[in-house]
Amino acid sequence: ADGYMESHPNVTIEMTDLGSTDYMTQLATQLAGGNGELDVLSIKDIPGYSNLINLGMLEPLSGKLTTDESKFNGVLKQLTAEDGNYYAVPFRSDFWVVYYNKDIFDQAGVEYPTNDMTMADFDAKIREVNEKAGVYGNIYHTWRSTTTLFGILDGQHTVIDGNYDFLKPYYEQVLSEQADGVIPNYGEQKTSGLHYSGAFENGQAAMCNMGSWFISTLQKYNAEAASNGVQPVNFGIVKYPHPDGAPAGSTLGTVTSLAVNANSEKKEAALDFVNWCASEDGAKCVAAVGTFPAVASDETNKIISSTDGFPSDDASLEALNTTAIYLEMPLSDKAS
């Protein structure tokens, strides 16, 4: 908002804090009865977004966006309702990558993972580094996302399909890795509370498939390592593993979007702000605070990669380039 007001001195944006607890429910309550007090709305999850569409509280934005829709890597299509309109535009994106501990790979004489790994390649890398380094090859956190959502990366399936046969090969791969002891046991992770961050930071696991938010966690961990009496993690990132036939850079993610109140008296001004947030200027402002913009570019990637503690290798910079982002939960009236 500050960046927009700097370039639009005639506009004042006042923020309203609805709190983080049950935010989308609070937002729906605020908009009830045709309340037009709020102009621009932050959309934080798909179920809440679906509810607001059904209640008629959001202005259709299809055809009103000034940024090329293709730059959103397919996300706008996934936000499109049954009536053919999308009612929100992403400005922030968190997508998944693979983190790896360079020191573990170096000491074991294992080549680093690459930016173009099939699921079979990922499995082989997990097994190789486990055998040669004596640590877990990867840690899959206990969320469903870490295993189930490999299945949506071919662009042909979603988790609301109703038929889940397509998930079988991915579960078989991970269960085989678990049976062979090259990854932590799921049950033991649940009972012990072993967290992916701790396992990766202390060298129990050579790799970790996780969202881009973990980058800032590791940057903070390394910045405070000396004062906390721990060793920093020499980490890198590469693109997410993909099924055969899917292009490298296919990944899963979540977005935070902006919408316009259908009852706003300042729709034109609100739409201009939404368009600015989706523009290159808006994306640079998002990147400047260490957050990944929904519309990335070489310029925003350079901003992100120039932050203190970001891996300096070319592969990590290239890992920021995605070709398709599949939402962890697609738009559906069944989403919850």
Q: What kind of feature is each model-predicted range?
A:
Residues 21-26, 152-234, 238-243, 268:
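Extracytoplasmic ligand-binding clamshell segments of periplasmic binding protein
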Residues 81, 298, 312-336:
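C-terminal capping/gating helix-and-loop segments adjacent to ligand/active sites or protein-protein/ligand interfaces
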Residues 44-95, 232-239, 314:
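Hinge/lid segment of periplasmic solute-binding proteins
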Residues 3, 7-72, 107-109, 199, ...:
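Extracytoplasmic "Venus flytrap"/periplasmic binding protein-like
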Residues 6-12, 16, 62, 80-145, ...:
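Helix-loop-helix "hinge/cap" segment bordering the ligand-binding cleft or interdomain interface
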Residues 42-47, 143, 210-218, 256:
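Beta->alpha turn/N-cap motifs
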Residues 108, 180-182, 223-292:
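Extracytoplasmic/periplasmic substrate-recognition and gating elements
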Residues 1, 24, 28, 46-49, ...:
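Extracytoplasmic/secreted envelope proteins and their assembly/folding machinery
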